[in-house]
Amino acid sequence: MHKVFISPSDQRRNTYASGNTNEAEVCGRIGAACRAALERCGFAVELVQYEPMSSKCAKSDAFGAELHLPIHTNAFNGKTSGTRIMCYALSGEGYKAAKAIFDVLAPLTPGTSENITAHPELYEIKNANAPTAYVEVDFHDVPEVAAWLTANTETIGETIAKGVCKYFGEAYIPACGNKADEPIAQPTRVGAWSAEARAWAIETGLINGIGQLDDGTPNYAWEAHVTREQLVTILHRFAQGIKREESSWSM
């Protein structure tokens, strides 16, 4: 079982250009999503956020991490944006891990100023025993990018996990819809619309569920992502339903 140590930013003072949030809050959510994805894929994961970098490196070493993974967001001039990943040198295991993550994360993020660079002087890169891929997801001082980062923490975490799986040569296992995936934290109108839409889709037969739950009943939980095949199937069922209704009206 491969071991990954996740070190999300603890920089609460780095406020976002939109969304009334900060780097620590968003990166904590990204790190948690990444941990959940990696554990689902069979990795042993330790995550430490609100401790000094020296403590993080010591715990990473004690854990026996095979990859040290700081997760941050960046800032510069309010205009530049894109994924930046840093490692010890542009060769070796740290670079391989950085490249594997970069290859899946950079196409996802909004920005285009993207690269992998060597920064052996950075504390966690220099002091952690494990190869380190230091991820700067994108730039939070650009308002539209800040909004995107805040809205997509789960997808970002999953994507970083995909890159880690690629680096270790392990299969990435996508999340399966289940009841635990979909708690509604607050009774918002959006949540109510979602529940109404699900009930309607089940009643009309637009969705047939994703496998079965432990009790044998269909699993109607929402999934994080919908494939094109699933979307077209749902639209086809909807169109067929309209045709049936139109036929009944003409009779």
Segments the model singles out, each with a brief description of its role:
Residues H2-F5, Q11-T15, T21-K179:
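Active-site-proximal helix/loop segments of hydrolytic enzymes
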Residues K179-M251:
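Short, solvent-exposed alpha-helical surface patches in non-cytosolic proteins
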